[in-house]
Structures are given as C-alpha cells and as structure tokens.
Design a protein with these regions (language model features):
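Short loop/helix-cap segments at secondary-structure boundaries that form the rim of catalytic
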Residues: 119, 139-140, 156-161
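A short beta-strand segment in extracellular, disulfide-stabilized domains
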Residues: 91-93
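Structural signature of tandem-repeat unit edges
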Residues: 55-63, 72-89, 99-112, 119-133, ...
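Sec-dependent N-terminal signal peptides
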Residues: 1-4
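C-terminal motif of bacterial Sec signal peptides marking the signal peptidase cleavage site
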Residues: 8-11
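N-terminal, intrinsically disordered, polar/charged segments of Gram-positive cell-envelope systems
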Residues: 16-55
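Conserved functional micro-motifs across diverse proteins
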Residues: 66-68
Length: 169
C-alpha cells in the first residue's frame, strides 16, 4: 500500500445544520446493487443508479445537504445529486472509509470536501468536471486507484501529477 496524498475543494454551506440519518422514499434498485466486486467494470460504475439516500448519514444545511457517512453495503456508491430536494454539495468528516467500498461516482453538485478520506479498498473514483481543486481529501492505496474524468480536466491533470491511473469518460 502506498502513502496517502491530500486534496480539497472550495465550498459553501448552509445555516441550519440538522443532523439526519436519511429515511429514503426511494427503493433500492436491486439490479443496481452489485455483490461481487470482482465482476465490476468502470462501465458498471458509470451506469449504476444513484445510491439511495437511506444509505447515507447527512446534515441538512437548510438549502443544501452535506454527506457525513456511507452506511450501505454496495461496493459502488453514486453520490445523489439531491437528497430531500436539496443539492448534495459536500462530503465531510471522512465518510468513505467503509471496507466494502470499491467504486465512487461523485455527484455533479459536489463543491466541497472537508477532511474526507477514502479507504485503500477504493479502486475507481469519478471526478466531475466542476472539481478544480482537491486539497482536503486523502486517498489511501492510490497505487491501485483509477480516476475517471473528462479529458483535459483537473481530474486528468491531478492524476498525472500524482502518478494515478486516469481514464477519460
């Protein structure tokens, strides 16, 4: 396992910080749940349904949501664009240390990482084009990590600078 590296994003927050465990009205799409991570491909991650809100602990900031923890068992996590009709704008306090986690697709509304870290079991992470700075995120095991993003984006530049495999979407 290789050492860690650090990254972060400029973000915004809300005013009302109500801590919640999500009670999702969504049904977990059984076809989207993958149990054998040895069979997962990057295309599986790209085509995977959003992870149900019930799999996350989050803070309601009033006009937005910050994800605190992932409690699901699916090795693929697709951060939802919204929870309870509010944009998911940040990941805080290292919620992605779940040992079953292999693949993460970050939502396009995501603006901030606050001391977030990803376990050494993570194999693929999709960084949307809007991500332009990673300063407060730690990846462990980056020698086995693949960053997926737009060609010519910050994600590609970052991957090359850090010696991480990059795949254009």
């Amino acid at each position: 396992m290789s050492g860690a590296f650090v990254m972060g994003l400029v973000g915004c927050g809300g005013t009302d910080s109500s801590d919640k465990s999500a009670e999702s009205k969504e049904n977990n799409n059984s076809e989207a749940f993958v149990t054998d991570s040895a069979e997962i491909t990057v295309d599986d991650v790209r085509n995977h349904a959003e992870t149900p809100a019930s799999d996350f602990e989050y803070i309601d900031n009033g006009d937005s949501v910050s994800i605190k923890a992932y409690n699901g068992s699916d090795p693929i996590v697709v951060i939802p664009e919204q929870i309870d009709g509010k944009d998911v704008i940040s990941i805080i306090n290292g919620p992605f240390s779940n040992d079953s986690l292999k693949y993460v697709d970050l939502g396009y509304n995501l603006k901030e990482f606050d001391d977030a870290y990803f376990s050494d079991t993570l194999e693929v992470i999709h960084l949307p084009a809007r991500v332009e700075n990673l300063d407060k995120v730690v990846f462990f095991g980056e020698d086995t990590l693949t960053i997926v993003g737009k060609a010519g984006s910050f994600a590609e530049t970052f991957a090359k600078e850090e010696g991480i495999k990059f795949e254009a979407e």
